[in-house]
Amino acid sequence: MVATSDNQVYNIPDNLRSFAPVLKKSSIMKVIVISTSLRTGSNSDMLADKFIEGAVAAGNEVEKISLTDKDIRFCKGCLACQKLGKCVIKDDANDIMQKVLNADAICWATPIYYYEMSGQMKTLIDRMNAMYSLDYKFRDVYLLTTAAEDEPDVPKRAEAGLCGWIDCYPKSRLAGTLFCGGVDAPRTIEGNKKLHEAFELGKNV
């Protein structure tokens, strides 16, 4: 089943039912997928959707959070969150943080801008600073990236930036990454083999 950020839960679509038995698990994983691109027809968002299909096919509960319609402002560095356990800024960041805290696995999807993660992804990471003093469930963290450039080292800085966040949560780890280069205009990733790789990565969460 799939849950959206509106807390709606969907059954596995008919076209995925043939994949449902691929992996037997002792328990269902709760997976949060955060798609950070704000562009319609985003290539990284399409990678995220394939990752979700794979995770659902493996029997997991998946919720996709798109930042497209979210209000997430910049961190002010006041550190009040360390005492309160939440941010004092009243926008969507606190709700997303609670979902991340209670997830078993997290997948970030971002376009690469100037060889780094998107600004909105970094802003959300900064705003979840309250988690540093809280207990958390997540263990495995995944990163999906896309870019116009196709050199293999294009996503390295984004991966390093995410690892800096992961290092603050010793029980978690970077469990997998996937990069698709050579995709610039919206939806140019259609038909790319990386979509299947994203499905397989999600299936093995």
Q: Which residue stretches match the model-derived regions?
A:
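N-terminal beta1-alpha1-beta2 submodule of the flavodoxin-like/Rossmannoid cofactor-binding fold
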Residues: 2-110, 115-131, 190-205
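A short small-residue
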Residues: 29-32, 105, 142-143, 178-185
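Cofactor-binding loop segments of dinucleotide-utilizing enzymes, especially the Rossmann-like FAD-
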Residues: 36, 67, 145-148, 180
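A short beta-to-alpha transition loop/helix N-cap that caps and shapes the active-site region
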Residues: 71-73, 150-152, 185-186
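Short, glycine-/small-residue-rich phosphate/pyrophosphate-handling segment
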Residues: 119-120, 132-177
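Short, solvent-exposed loop/turn segments at secondary-structure boundaries
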Residues: 153-156, 187-192
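A charged, well-structured terminal subsegment
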Residues: 162-183, 189, 199, 204-205
